[in-house]
């Protein structure tokens, strides 16, 4: 694969106009910005003067009116004028500077824990100040701690005529300094217009201002601006910037896909007919949705450009067998396929499934994981390097040095959000010895709503498996308060007597692995005592991988009836005999996590149940989450509601598209902009390619390389 070109290489920008030259000026061109301050500003993503314009306010404060001290209430933020009546150093636990000011209607204390001698001298008795800060009740009455203030020359001073922006800060750049620098950048904007990369014929959603108008408004909103609208991100000025930001991200993903498609790939013809024989040998038939997804993949695999396809579908929908059929096409073409799973446990489960499916065809499937005995590992690696073994399953160990493939034509990645882009790239690069890039099939059990998928995964083709195999019954879900815990334990005893198995998922009381392990151990001990005839096992994150796998395999074999676990089973083994799951402290978990956990039961023909055990009082958000999980087993509906409740960042996990770090846009809130974003992206790529690099540099960074895999 050729080195991935940057956007500027793919789409060189036109020569700079005077406005663009101003836009490219380094931030050190501003008065008072030396190397040290420039280094601090770089942490905010500011290297050019124009970058300051895109450091947008987090919120606004109304300093356009002065409040009487006597009318102040604790908890409000206010501007006040007053004369210093007393300044003193106090020692109440720590050294502090106290100033008492009065405006005739009341007295207010200003408290400073960090101050200099010159600051103390400047706050002399009789000095008039204008202060702004949060009012709170202190030991001496109402006070402000470290308020912003300035001295007043006369009895009064002009008030602010716009709302005051509050910007995100970085260490060493105080709010006032950043505000002044952005003000200087705005003055430059007045003198030399910022380049608007959107062409005149781009049809923006109605009511959106120009780029210059939008930036001016957001940095200096008039006093009559609607704070609620700005706080909600719904003002037309914000939507204008959100549109451009979404467009920049969408373009970069499309270019990543285009760059990838310019590389040659193996054309998998399957002359041996292995795919057909694989499907005929299966003990079940594919569903319509599985067949459709496989057809998509087969068409891609027959082409001479690399497939990069996302296979998404709910827990238990049968993604693995589709991936295995794609692997059969590679093997039938005399080439190799590798399936990479996020854990050794899941890798072994996939290996067992593929081993059984490929056995009737005489095709050996190798497992490569960290836990293999040295001799077995050496033998497997030699067979992979020679091409004798054509289907390989493993963990991240697959992309490590020392593992060589003869002719790797297909890379399958399970639970893609658990791997970074670079990990997938390293595995794909192992297939480039013959100058061809392997095809990639990326599986995820996180159903992504269509609108979000079209934007967040614009660099991938998408197949959806939207039905479960026949015989699967929906999991009956109930929400139960902690006070009925005894009834839940009795239900576990009943299930175990009937020969069924049970999961008990432990509460997430703390982020610490140690505390989670302790909670799991205490829960297991308590349940063992309450259920004397039941064989109880334990799995938590602090156990050695071998011990964890041993417990999970014992559960799968039926030697353990009740498995107490932390959320390490979220992606785990397939145990059709497990028909009951109890999720303790369910109110602490997110929708997607609850749905993923619930997917561990209901994998056989027997009716299954999930108990969501909660502790009161429930927040409104937690109540809504539990209600959604109780009412729906549809992963796509749950993902849609999850997106509404949490936003796209968490839903996408560590997906490295930058969409989780959007500065202005919000994929759920701004979903109505996306169709127009996609239209505008096509217009720019077709007719204004010289604008693409500038737009991406503004919102994402000129140094980013977008031709990467995945």
Task: Kindly give the residue locations of the regions a language model identified.
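Structural detector for short beta-strands of small beta-barrel domains
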Residues: 74-95, 133
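Upstream accessory/linker segments immediately N-terminal to the RecA-like ATPase cores of bacterial MutS
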Residues: 37, 90-281, 654, 687
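Short, surface-exposed secondary-structure boundary micro-motifs
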Residues: 83, 134-135, 586, 600
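C-terminal accessory region of SF2 helicases/translocases
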Residues: 605, 609, 617-710
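Long, highly charged, low-complexity intrinsically disordered interaction regions
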Residues: 1-30, 39-42, 249, 259
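Inter-lobe coupling/hinge segments of SF2-like helicase ATPases
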Residues: 292-295, 305-628, 687-691, 710
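Short boundary/loop segments of OB/S1/cold-shock single-stranded nucleic-acid-binding domains
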Residues: 58-78
């Amino acid at each position: 694969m050729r080195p991935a070109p940057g956007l500027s290489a793919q789409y060189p920008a036109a020569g700079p106009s005077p406005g663009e030259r101003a836009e490219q000026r380094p931030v050190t061109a501003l008065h008072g910005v030396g190397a040290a301050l420039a280094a601090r500003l770089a942490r905010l993503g500011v290297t050019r003067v124009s970058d300051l314009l895109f450091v947008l306010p987090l919120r606004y404060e109304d300093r356009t009116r002065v409040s009487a001290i006597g009318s102040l209430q604790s908890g409000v933020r206010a501007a006040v004028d007053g004369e210093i009546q007393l300044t003193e150093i106090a020692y109440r636990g720590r050294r502090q500077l106290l100033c008492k000011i009065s405006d005739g209607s009341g007295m207010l204390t200003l408290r400073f824990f960090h101050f200099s001698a010159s600051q103390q001298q400047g706050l002399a008795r009789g000095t008039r100040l204008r202060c702004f800060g949060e009012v709170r009740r202190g030991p001496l009455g109402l006070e402000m701690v470290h308020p912003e203030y300035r001295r007043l020359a006369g009895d009064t001073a002009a008030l602010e005529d716009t709302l005051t922006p509050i910007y995100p800060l970085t260490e060493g750049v105080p709010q006032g300094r950043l505000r002044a620098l952005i003000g200087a950048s705005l003055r430059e904007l007045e003198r030399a217009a910022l380049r608007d990369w959107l062409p005149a014929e781009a049809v923006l959603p109605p009511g959106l201002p120009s780029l210059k108008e939008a930036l001016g408004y957001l940095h200096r909103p008039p006093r009559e601006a609607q704070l609620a609208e700005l706080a909600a991100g719904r003002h037309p000025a914000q939507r204008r910037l959100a549109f451009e930001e979404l467009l920049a991200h969408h373009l970069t993903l499309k270019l990543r896909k285009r760059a990838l498609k310019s590389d040659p790939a193996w054309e998998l013809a399957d002359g041996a007919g292995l795919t057909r024989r694989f499907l005929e040998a299966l003990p079940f038939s594919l569903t319509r949705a599985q067949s459709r997804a496989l057809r998509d993949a087969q068409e891609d695999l027959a082409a001479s450009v690399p497939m990069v396809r996302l296979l998404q579908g709910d827990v238990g929908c049968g993604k693995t067998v589709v991936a295995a059929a794609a692997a059969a096409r590679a093997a039938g073409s005399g080439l190799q396929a590798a399936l990479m799973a996020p854990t050794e446990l899941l890798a072994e489960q996939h290996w067992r499934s593929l081993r059984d499916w490929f056995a009737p065809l005489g095709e050996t499937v190798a497992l490569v994981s960290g836990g293999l005995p040295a001799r077995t590992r050496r033998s497997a690696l030699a067979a992979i390097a020679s091409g004798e073994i054509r289907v390989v399953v493993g963990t991240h160990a697959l992309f490590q040095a020392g593992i060589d493939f003869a002719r790797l034509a297909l890379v399958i990645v399970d639970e893609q959000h658990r791997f970074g882009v670079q990990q997938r790239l390293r595995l794909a690069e192992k297939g480039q010895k013959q100058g061809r890039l392997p095809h990639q099939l990326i599986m995820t059990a996180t159903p992504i709503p269509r609108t979000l998928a079209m934007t967040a995964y614009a660099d991938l083709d998408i197949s959806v498996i939207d039905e479960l195999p026949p015989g699967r019954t929906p999991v009956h879900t109930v929400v139960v308060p902690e006070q009925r815990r005894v009834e839940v334990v009795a239900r576990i005893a009943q299930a175990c007597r009937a020969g069924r198995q049970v999961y008990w998922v432990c509460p997430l009381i703390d982020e610490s692995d140690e505390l989670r392990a302790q909670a799991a151990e205490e829960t297991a001990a308590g349940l063992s005592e309450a259920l004397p005839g039941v064989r109880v096992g334990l799995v938590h994150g602090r156990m050695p991988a071998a011990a964890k796998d041993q417990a999970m395999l014992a559960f799968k074999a039926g030697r353990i009836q009740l498995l107490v676990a932390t959320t390490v089973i979220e992606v785990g083994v397939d145990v059709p005999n497990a028909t009951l799951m109890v999720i303790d402290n369910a109110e602490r978990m997110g929708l997607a996590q609850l749905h993923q956990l619930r997917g561990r039961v209901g994998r056989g023909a027997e009716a299954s149940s999930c108990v969501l055990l909660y502790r009161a009082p429930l927040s409104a958000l937690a109540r809504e989450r539990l209600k959604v999980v109780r009412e729906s087993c549809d992963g796509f509906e749950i993902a849609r509601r999850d997106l509404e409740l949490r936003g796209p960042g968490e839903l996408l996990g560590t997906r490295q598209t930058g969409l989780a770090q959007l500065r202005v846009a919000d994929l759920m809130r701004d979903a109505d902009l996306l169709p127009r974003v996609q239209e505008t992206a096509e217009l720019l790529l077709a007719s204004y390619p010289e604008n693409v690099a500038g737009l991406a540099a503004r919102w994402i960074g000129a140094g980013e390389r977008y031709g990467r895999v995945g």
